[in-house]
UniProtKB/Swiss-Prot annotation:
Its cofactor is FMNH2. SUPFAM superfamilies: Chorismate synthase, AroC (SSF103263). The gene is aroC. The lineage of its organism: Bacteria, Pseudomonadati, Pseudomonadota, Betaproteobacteria, Burkholderiales. This is Chorismate synthase. It comes from Polynucleobacter asymbioticus (strain DSM 18221 / CIP 109841 / QLW-P1DMWA-1) (Polynucleobacter necessarius subsp. asymbioticus). This reaction introduces a second double bond into the aromatic ring system.
Amino acid sequence: MSGNTLGLLFTVTTFGESHGPAIGAVVDGCPPGMTLSEADIQADLDRRKPGTSRHVTQRKEEDKVEILSGVFEGKTTGAPIGLLIRNTDQRSQDYGDILQTFRPGHADYAYHYKYGFRDPRGGGRSSARLTAPVVAAAAIAKKWLKEHYGTEFYGYMGQLGEIEVPFQDKKHIAENPFFAANSEIIPQLEGYMDELRKAGDSCGARIEVRASNVPIGLGEPLFDKLDADIAHAMMGINAVKGVEIGAGFKSVSQRGSVHGDDLHPDGFASNNSGGTLGGISSGQELRVAIAIKPTSSIMTPKHSVDIKGQPITVQTKGRHDPCVGIRATPIAEAMLALVLMDHALRHRAQCGDVELAVPPIPASRPGSQLD
């Protein structure tokens, strides 16, 4: 099985399965000399881990990260950094009934016909459990980007099922299990999820993620554009079915006189481009949104076939997220951080000595509201 590595200079290779003894990542290309401890990584893992509210899977995993290599006396050495997260709450018996069947919407059918053999326990390699080492690896990238450029990341839920979640203030994001930047809508979201669970069904979500203080010049035309690599990474998140950069699909209904972001000596007037121009970062805030499909593992009976091609009815058991989007915010932040880290090192390698007499304009004009 290939396709387990992301990045060119800053690479992350994940390993493990949902119900194996452990999952983890090997991070290669991290510059030496950065202070790094397990505590630096754990905070983001705690934001992603399961069992944190009644609205997500009740699988209890502490997701405690162990640094196995690449750090000596509290500093990165430049060697590959090995990260390990042990699985402690597997219930593989919940998946005995699906060994010979295919769950609608899951990777079961495609994995079976690609590999001829699959691990059905919790989805095996296709499980969202494998996003934990991605988040762990990205904590390293976030730290380096913060120290060198002041880059900051935050994400939030923009929509849960049919309910749009208007942005109110990012201070609310850490105050609720939905990562919603709106405190007033939480009771409605909780009621919606309670009804969804009673119905044995699931829903999708829209997640917004932002990065500020991104240096100008990240991205490589033509086929390694920054936004192209962001989309590639975001589509690597389980259940993601769509990616938008900036105005995204709203660009279709915009006119050029509106969509083009005017430049002024005191800054950009708007940010429909989402922080990239020609696939290269403009210095503006990077704005990305992802669409996450409804969870495929539901209690509602669904039609399917078994491995012999015979018709069956599937009613999924086990512990599952009724909306995987609820825990997706730190994962989306992680993917964005990994792409930026990789491109930052690539830009530094090729264009690190480029100097211009005229400094760049500010990311936004004073007092402007960039929507």
